[in-house]
């Protein structure tokens, strides 16, 4: 383990939100490549959990906890500073580390806004009560977000796409693990 990093357990609700790209400056700051266009989850979490890069990890192994002092947008990326990462050499040692934060530390979503991670795995049903599938992933097409559903037909895995816009989405029931849509099964 690198000096200053604490060994830790990955929280049960941990979500991978980015990775450390490189050192930034000489005072221990480092560049972060967030996986989201809105890095708000990175900014709200005071503790980040690091896993080594998937290949060639030489600096640390296992899960490490990092206490974040500050994180901010800089140009097209995010830069951050952490306790016990005091110089460029320490920051360089984190290069490639995968960043996880506890889902419980995300800021609350606004009304009728959802974190994609909360939608994955939900069952989708249309107004007629027909099961449309389970949310496998979401795609951003630029104009809108699209739900990618997975369902089985004749024993074969199939995919169906539904735009995630209010015209087609009647209700998102996170506690009920369900999305109600205005969409025909044969469309």
Curated annotation (Swiss-Prot):
- The gene that this protein is the product of is rimM
Q: Which family does it belong to?
A: Belongs to the RimM family.
Q: Where in the cell is it found?
A: Cytoplasm
UniProt superkingdom: Bacteria
| Manganese found in the keyword field | no
* Sorted UniProt keywords: Chaperone, Cytoplasm, Ribosome biogenesis, rRNA processing
Question: Quaternary structure per UniProt?
Answer: Binds ribosomal protein uS19.
Tell me what this protein is called. Answer: Ribosome maturation factor RimM
